Amino acid sequence: MKETVLGSHLRKVPSIAVGCMRLSEKSKDEMNHFIHSALEQGAYFFDHADIYGGGMSESVFGEAFADDPSLKREDMYLQSKCGIRQGCYDLSKEHILESVDGILKRLQTDYLDLLLLHRPDALVEPEEVAAAFDVLFESGKVRHFGVSNHKPMQIALLQKLSLIHISEPTRH
């Protein structure tokens, strides 16, 4: 599969991310087959979000991953998104930190390769978001950060305030 460089951290990933939004109703065996099929095609970049299936998409993926010793964490690039609650956006530091803890628990992994903010939240100061990113990076829970559906000015402000680099995935 063709690869592309993701963001400025110069990590090569498949040009196509495997979307996991509609997988919440799969059985563990079906999910295991899904993961293996993707990996066999060279698609090791899995895209999740804490709201997909109310978290069930991540849970089923995590169960299938954890129960199969042939699946190695280092062979996958796991991305998830946070910041959307039922009926509102929430990028408060508290919500971001709680979301990541839930994501890691559901995916049954110690870290995310990439965390994206799903949508901007105009009610939260960018400094609060940047502080959450710094905590997650320093704790080793998240290796890289990015945004989805943000304007260039919003990205620049977060980059200015955070200790780590933030980027928006390229759209193809």
Q: Positions of the model-derived regions?
A:
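N-terminal binding-site loop/beta-alpha segment at the start of enzyme catalytic domains
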Residues: M1-M76
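Conserved, mostly hydrophobic/aromatic
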Residues: V18, F46, F61, L78, ...
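Active-site mouth loops of central-metabolism enzymes
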Residues: G19-D29, C82-E94
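Short, acidic/polar
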Residues: S27-A38, L91-R106, I155
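Distinct, well-ordered alpha-helical segments
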Residues: E58-P69, V100-D101, V124-A132, K151-L163
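Short helix-capping segments at alpha-helix termini
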Residues: D67-D75, L107-Q108, L136-K141, L161-I164
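Active-site groove signature of glycoside hydrolases
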Residues: L107-A122
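Conserved small/polar residues in nucleotide/adenosyl-binding loops
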Residues: I164-H172
